């Protein structure tokens, strides 16, 4: 970089050349990448006007590339509620490389498919999860809890949607947003099942908590990273507008390949004042390789069995904060049905429910919840996995 006069060369150290953004490419052979779809994250601290100007420029660049390379939709989603400004869309390779080289951009990465983390379905199996988290010893089916039961706390179910009219939810469930299609109902059942665990009348932990459905996954239980980022941003904005930051919980029974933007938005949501319970994943491997389980500031949950062992499908590792029941868990399904599922998807809502329960009972804030859960937990898990906690969720019932 040169200047007209040597007298002002000192400015080079004070104002270095603007740095281009980082282009993060998918690993060779990756099967979860959405073709020609990208997530663009802006530099921290960028102003709203500069962000808008950048998007206008990106749209212009995309329009030029469409004339040469075919149809690419360009910018499709934008977000900023968590403090991470960015957008997603479909771009030609030439265009996305120009975007990545823009000095306002921090990084660009591929958009990916994300899936629910349920594992096995078995009908008519017995329940043990509620009894297990409220008794220090296994074998007791009685669920023991304070009558406050999460009253005044809101839990966001970021999932396939929720059957909000199911009698299990007693009118406490409302529809929030849909970031994947135009069908405002749970087409899969997974989201209704997890909501039944964290706040259902019969199957739930926090039986008086409010429930908000945030649909980011389709009938097959799949969605995009960008859609989930939009859903998380919606939750933060909703909590802020309703003055419940610090008194809100988010259940994320989903996950995919480790993604920087996914982890960043999850961390930002936690920092904003929402307690995040996150499924560790069902690949039987280190959860450090998955998102958002590897995000800082979230409470990452592995799945235990009725025998207090790690479920063989459950991910493990140093990023895991707690174990919770996740094998053979019964709960509700759409259209007044019931279903038994297994997976870290079923473990995470136990933790979301206990988080809401403790926030209501003890008056603690969202940022204190995960550490409180870990302090109350019991050292019960046998063979938890390499570098993994052996602590099992417990609601401090005293029994």
Curated annotation (Swiss-Prot):
GO terms for molecular function: serine-type endopeptidase activity. Residues 127-399 form the Peptidase S8 domain. It holds the Pfam family Inhibitor_I9. One of its GO terms (biological process) is proteolysis. InterPro entries: PCSK9_ProteinaseK-like (IPR034193), Peptidase_S8/S53_dom (IPR000209), Peptidase_S8/S53_dom_sf (IPR036852), Peptidase_S8_Ser-AS (IPR023828), Peptidase_S8_subtilisin-like (IPR050131), Peptidase_S8_subtilisin-rel (IPR015500), S8pro/Inhibitor_I9 (IPR010259), S8pro/Inhibitor_I9_sf (IPR037045). It is found in: Secreted. Its main location: secreted. Coiled coil: none annotated. The keyword Nucleotide-binding does not apply. The keyword Hydrolase applies. Transmembrane segments: none annotated. Keywords: Glycoprotein, Hydrolase, Protease, Secreted, Serine protease, Signal, Virulence, Zymogen. Glycans are attached at residues 115, 251, 395. GO terms for cellular component: extracellular region. Residues 37-116 form the Inhibitor I9 domain. Residues 21-117 form a propeptide. The active site is at 159 (charge relay system), 190 (charge relay system), 345 (charge relay system). Belongs to the peptidase S8 family. Secreted subtilisin-like serine protease with keratinolytic activity that contributes to pathogenicity. This is Subtilisin-like protease CPC735_033790.
């Amino acid at each position: 970089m040169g200047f007209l006069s040597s007298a002002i060369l000192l400015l080079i150290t004070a104002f270095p050349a603007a740095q281009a953004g980082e282009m993060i490419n998918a690993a060779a052979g990756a099967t979860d990448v959405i073709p020609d779809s990208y997530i663009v994250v802006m530099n921290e601290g960028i102003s709203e006007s500069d962000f808008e100007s950048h998007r206008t420029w990106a749209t212009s660049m995309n329009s030029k590339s469409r004339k040469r390379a075919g149809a690419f939709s360009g910018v499709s989603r934008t977000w900023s509620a968590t403090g991470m400004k960015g957008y997603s869309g479909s771009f030609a390779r030439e265009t996305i490389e120009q975007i990545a080289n823009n000095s306002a951009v921090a990084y660009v990465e591929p958009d990916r498919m994300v899936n629910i983390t349920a594992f096995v379905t078995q009908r008519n199996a017995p329940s043990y999860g509620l009894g297990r988290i409220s008794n220090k010893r296994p074998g007791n089916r009685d669920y023991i809890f304070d009558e406050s039961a999460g009253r005044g706390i809101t839990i966001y179910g970021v999932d396939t949607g929720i059957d909000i009219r199911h009698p299990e939810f007693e009118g406490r469930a409302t529809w929030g947003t849909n970031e994947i299609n135009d069908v405002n109902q749970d087409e899969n059942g997974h989201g209704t099942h997890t909501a039944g665990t964290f706040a259902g009348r019969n199957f739930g932990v926090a039986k008086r908590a409010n429930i908000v459905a945030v649909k980011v996954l389709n009938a097959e239980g799949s969605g995009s990273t960008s859609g989930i980022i939009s859903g998380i941003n919606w939750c933060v904005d909703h909590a802020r507008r309703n003055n419940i930051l610090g008194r809100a919980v988010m259940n994320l029974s989903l996950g995919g390949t480790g993604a920087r933007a996914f982890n960043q938005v999850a961390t930002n949501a936690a920092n904003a004042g929402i307690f995040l319970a996150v499924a560790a994943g069902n690949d039987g491997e280190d959860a450090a390789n998955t998102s958002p389980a590897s995000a800082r500031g979230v409470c990452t949950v592995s799945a235990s069995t009725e025998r207090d062992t790690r479920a063989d499908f459950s991910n493990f590792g140093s990023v895991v904060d707690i174990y919770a029941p996740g094998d053979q868990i019964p709960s509700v399904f759409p259209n007044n049905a019931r279903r038994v599922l297994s997976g870290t998807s079923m473990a995470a809502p136990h933790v979301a429910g206990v988080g809401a329960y403790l926030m209501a009972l003890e008056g603690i804030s969202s940022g204190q919840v995960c550490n409180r859960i870990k302090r109350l937990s019991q050292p019960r898990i046998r063979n938890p996995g390499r570098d993994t906690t052996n602590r099992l969720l417990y609601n401090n019932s005293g029994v």
